[in-house]
């Protein structure tokens, strides 16, 4: 038996073990264990189906090779072997993809944070443009988008916007969006027709639960203050706005979108946990990168990952040297798969 066949046999054995465990009284009565084992079985279900088919094809090849010695059946066996060898090759390709280590965060919802960087008002306008493109992409994927916090600028853009995106495989599709996005275009306010360069940062933070990120209450500094509107005017007369600082890391989150202090505190704490988890992921990625020839990107917000050049209708993805001359169509349709699919393929190729 080949190394691949042995590996697939062990996966099938584990799948059968999990099936038996999930029907046992001991596991059924333990919700935590039941959930844990159900997730594990679900994670290997696709590879298990492919494994059964592959091992069946190997058995078919073995049987037909034996039939080659039979004068009456040899021609039929030859034809059958041709078909089986093609199936074997196709299954091996599919199985190699399925055996690539799965990111444990791939099925999580995310907090998407877009923040204006260099470029003043134009950067804020592009935050709004890119946010709309992400919303269109979410619509295509049947995901749900909820605005958690937003800070508008004076020209219709955003200084910062944070949204929660929920749906199947959200993190797996959007995790490579983290970093600095640069835009080159002529602003509407530019009378001389000069091209301006602006930049915004994108952060992708998996939504986490209390089990995944545990925070010691004594590590938190919680401040309350009055929420302010545009130009500093007061939008309510109570101390409803909340700022939470995680003292060991100095990561701080402010929230004032809700009128209730309790709701603002709850939102701020969720985003703080997501940021702490994001920090853990970045540290792990940097450690893993040392063992790999190349990486798509660390997810570091300071890393310039993409340029949107409107005069040339060009989108350049710097991490994989991808250039597309369909920028406006991508932004208006939200069809970000044109960029995301090559990024995912590149990341997977690093494990082959």
Curated annotation (Swiss-Prot):
Keyword vocabulary terms for this entry = Cytoplasm, Methylation, Protein biosynthesis
Places the protein is found: Cytoplasm
Q: Name one GO molecular function term.
A: translation release factor activity, codon specific
Query: Which PROSITE patterns does the record match to this protein?
Result: RF_PROK_I (PS00745)
Q: Which residues carry this modification: N5-methylglutamine?
A: 233
Q: Which residues form the signal peptide?
A: none
Superkingdom field: Bacteria
Q: What is the stated purpose of this protein?
A: Peptide chain release factor 1 directs the termination of translation in response to the peptide chain termination codons UAG and UAA.
Name used for this protein in its record? Peptide chain release factor 1
Species per Swiss-Prot/TrEMBL record? Helicobacter pylori (strain J99 / ATCC 700824)
